[in-house]
Amino acid sequence: MKCKDLIKHTFTITNSTERFPKKYRFTLVNRIQEKAVDIYEMTLEANELDLRQADEHRQRQRLQAKALTYCKELLFFIELSQEMGFISMKSCEYWSKLALEVKYMIAAWKKRDLSLIHISEPTRHSLIS
């Protein structure tokens, strides 16, 4: 749910031409929207992998790490949007909070996976639903 909430909020804010002028549509806005969707895609792909298989576990760790990197990149774009005057400080704080919640959940999930690699059942996480 958290990823979905982040994507919905990201699209709601960035689709407003009152906030983000059209001249930034194909530069900043598209990158912001793509990062939010990329976070979801990485978590979904990682969640589909089986921890019982070593190669899938390694791939899952890589996807989780990539999702964390995308969270950091999205946070940068959110901050940049505020600094450029496209969003208020209050909007920046709320949007950042959503992104940070996702980031912390992915980090905790990644850490938990490291301690669960020896169990026989694959771990599924509700972050992406």
Model regions and ranges:
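Amphipathic alpha-helical assembly/interaction segments
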Residues: 1-116, 120
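Single conserved hydrophobic/aromatic residue that forms the stacking wall/gate
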Residues: 117-129
